[in-house]
Amino acid sequence: MAFLYENMDFMRENGYTAELPAYIPENLNPNFELRPYQKMAFENFITHYESPRRPKPTQVLFHMATGSGKTLIMAGLMLYLYKQGYRNFLFFVNLSNIVEKTKENFLNAASSKYLYADEIVLDGERIHINQVDNFQYAERDAINICFATTQG
């Protein structure tokens, strides 16, 4: 069985990779310029997601160093997946302090580490981020995030 990165290398060499949609960087915080490897992570995910041969359910792992921008990539992928029809996202981590920092980054527009642009606009519609305790209270036209931790 081939590793995904081997398939991605083959696809890239043969011109099959997806481009980063403009709406992703346009809706992320302009203070966080995407680095080349982050753009590649987006392109790899989108290429894999759009492949008719991808396994379902789809599970991916971003193996990246601390401080490399994984959470920013997750914010951008939520935008991409929203456009694909997804509305509900579970952010699950092992430590309470990490989940609190993550909430701040996703929800507090006044934070210097806020991940999104001042306004999130997809296809001319303003989208907001909605924190939920469970998806029973999810909003139909929002990015609904349930933050959870194994620590309770």
Give the positions of each predicted feature.
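RecA-like P-loop NTPase motor core of helicase/translocase proteins
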Residues: 1-152
